[in-house]
Amino acid sequence: MYKLGVDLGGTKIEAVLLDENFNVIKRKRILTPQNNYQKILDSISSLVKELSENTFDYSLGICTPGAISKQTGLIKNSNTQCLIGKSLKEDLENKLDKKISMENDANCFALAEATLGIAVDFDLVFGVILGTGVGGGIVINKKLYPGRTNIAGEWGHHTLHRNGNLCYCGKTGCVETYISGPSLENNWTKLTGKSQHLPEILTDIDNKYWVKWKTEFLENFGYGLANVIDILDPDAIVLGGGLSNIDFLYTEGKESIYNQVFSDLVDTPILKNKLGDSAGVFGACML
């Protein structure tokens, strides 16, 4: 059976068709319609129909930003906010007249890296998304572990600082409000009064506030993932998303994590992803 996967991202929608040996047969990317749920449905439907033309025996998986409520089937906790409260899976199944498997982007990322990517040699893998948002997914023996209510791995909404920054989820102090890309940019602006994008910040090392900004980033990163290790003790942690390209996360960042873990022996591998920004779409294929 062929496998068709769709990755619904904040800026792009990617679809890929794989054969039984995971070879890419067809692939296409388009821009994501902004703040328009109906146009998102139409775009995904058109992509699926285009890539599945003349292919009748295929599974369909969708990778989406945000968790899916096990009770209601509605999207929740999504930073693509026009999806929140929507029955995306049901609406697409009705539109395409086909059964769909659907998981959030962090779960798809983790599954792809654990089955096809950098973490194929590990049994218990925690996949981390660090980008516009912060998320995570757990894979055990090449199978996703969703948890009782489909929120396993959602470390981005752990409380890092009580009464801290306000999060779009309605709570305060979430990890995401400290180490996501926009949060890091906001912190830089508070420190310096300058509005800069993250790539510029990372090279502005002569700024007198740069060391303070970096130190706070590393501390929050370390505390956040140390909590994950204390609870889950994974065989490996894989970093994905735009921030995974920051080299010091694998050196000073790893040291910051290890310093906070409750153990006298800490050797958890902190790995850079292998599949890049296509991990989501390959993970969708594997659902």
Where are these regions (language model features)?
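A short acidic/small-residue loop/turn micro-motif
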Residues: 31-33, 59, 83, 151-154
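A cytosolic small-molecule/anion-sensing beta-strand core signal
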Residues: 19, 64, 140-141
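Residue-level detector of high-confidence beta-strand sites
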Residues: 27-29, 78, 147
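Glycine-rich phosphate-binding loop of actin/hexokinase-like ATP-binding domains
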Residues: 120-178
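A charged helix-plus-loop insertion that forms the helical arch/lid used to bind
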Residues: 73-85
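ATP-binding/phosphotransfer module of carbohydrate and carboxylate kinases, centering on a glycine-rich
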Residues: 1-59, 69-72, 90-98, 115-121, ...
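ATP-dependent carbohydrate kinase catalytic cores
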Residues: 98-114, 120, 126-128
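A secondary-structure boundary/capping signal
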Residues: 9, 63-64, 79, 130
